[in-house]
């Protein structure tokens, strides 16, 4: 069975929804024809010349880091990145990026990192707020007209909750108003305070149907100026967001946990470094694949003993250590995100099976490639 690039993109967009990407990010298809047949997929953190060399003809290169992001106004073949784009296109190869959408997806980059170091994830470190895609309507209507108004908003699309329709809640109360000159009150008269037995009717409706529900409510409501409220509902987080929090099988000293990280992650020139009491017992850990010092304040307030991330800068780390007992473990950026490659590969394998060969490129693309102390070359 042949697999089109568009089919692969559909699966990747389901696993790593583009809506989760940061506003500044660039994710999705970089080059390639969605209608073309894809013979294989290679997964890597970065698109470098050495990585591109490993992508077979008519293959897709799925990467985490965007090749084209900031300030790109040319892909000329005599530029470092442009030459890669030309090489890919000339041989029928495609390039696709899942970056901050993969960071926040569930499972995503930090889930893969947590799993690699032996954590059982039980929370999101910095959850993504749910999209406000539902409204709650509160409508105040004379009791004798409440059924008509309720029926009208139901017809306009309100009142659906899961597998149920015509859902509403109401309570009796008393409405009060004073009509002034120019008004045409349906009940009472100008200049007289009126008190009316009313129902407070509550329903939910899709935010996209707001105009239709409003028009239906106004048409069915007897009042010239109906009283109503619209509340945009934000659903609770559903597991997406930056970073994860998880537990070790049993507590262990920080020095042992650091050794665990060193063994679990692929070797890099910069290795693993930590800040904290070596004898601190660690059982609950926060992780964030990629640069994570923006979450230090969140980590300090979390119920964790250690934080694993990358690219920790001197001053933010110093300020954290002065104010918090949470140990810091800084690993190479590439190493913290490499476990995601296996996760992404498994997403595709589980969907396409033998019809689409998928492999993980193990080339270390961390820019730091020489360990001065040992002379070990990671290139």
Curated annotation (Swiss-Prot):
* Protein's UniProt keywords contain Protease: no
User: GO cellular component annotations, sorted alphabetically?
Assistant: cytoplasm
Q: Which domain of life is it from?
A: Bacteria
Q: Which GO terms describe its molecular function?
A: metal ion binding
Residue positions annotated to bind a divalent metal cation 1 are 64, 103, 337
**Cross-referenced SUPFAM superfamilies, in alphabetical order?**
NIF3 (NGG1p interacting factor 3)-like
Keywords, alphabetical: Metal-binding
* Keyword Metal-binding appears in the UniProt entry: yes
Per UniProt, a divalent metal cation 2 binds at: 65, 333, 337
Family to which this protein belongs: Belongs to the GTP cyclohydrolase I type 2/NIF3 family.
Summary of subunit composition and partner proteins: Homohexamer.
Q: Kindly provide the name given to this protein in its UniProt entry.
A: GTP cyclohydrolase 1 type 2 homolog
Lineage, broadest ranks: Bacteria, Bacillati, Actinomycetota, Actinomycetes, Mycobacteriales
